[in-house]
């Protein structure tokens, strides 16, 4: 995919931030961006909190979820969702959940993400929205750690479809309660309008095309592998 040359981006520094659960997804995209636009100087910060774009000098924050303050400008980079999953070994030791309330009695792997309530999974289904309180012996603020624990059979995780799709296809993970999911759309959030900042416009457009190419949209209900019952 080709992009127009951005002469005004020369020797421009662009500071980006992302939640601690997402660096492995964003880092390859920024590497490709750097190859395409060597005149851009990129700084990539990983944060486990919401950043103050103005006071912290951040040009672009990549956020997951649709809850964005109205004073900020946002453009959706990709549609995504999270699914509930566990390893076959875990499901052999524990009765697979048959309804959402069963999660309260099972070990769950909880991620502390920015301003999200800890241990409360906000899920969607065809019937509407649901909130379930979950607990477990292991928790982290890093998605890759929780992903590995899930593969190790330590509990049920709520993970991005992007992260677990290959594990589910290979049988290393099994999707449970597939009628439930959590929206996890990816947004570029910034304070300067794209028309006034060539470096931000170039970065946002590149990331949007990159995610569309590497992470095509996948409907939540189409991702079901098994109900675990």
For every predicted segment, state its role.
Residues 1-7:
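Alpha-helical linker/hinge and terminal dimerization helices associated
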Residues 11-70, 220-226:
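Central regulatory/effector-binding core of bacterial HTH transcription factors
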Residues 33, 119-133:
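Ligand-binding cleft/hinge of the Venus flytrap
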Residues 42-46, 110, 132-142:
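Short beta-strand-to-loop elements that line the ligand-binding cleft
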Residues 71-82, 86-111, 126:
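Flexible hinge/capping segments at coil-to-helix
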Residues 74-77, 170-182:
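Short beta-strand->loop
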Residues 147-172:
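A ligand-binding cleft/hinge motif common to bilobed small-molecule-binding domains
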Residues 161-166, 170, 180-229:
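C-terminal effector-binding regulatory domain of bacterial HTH transcription factors
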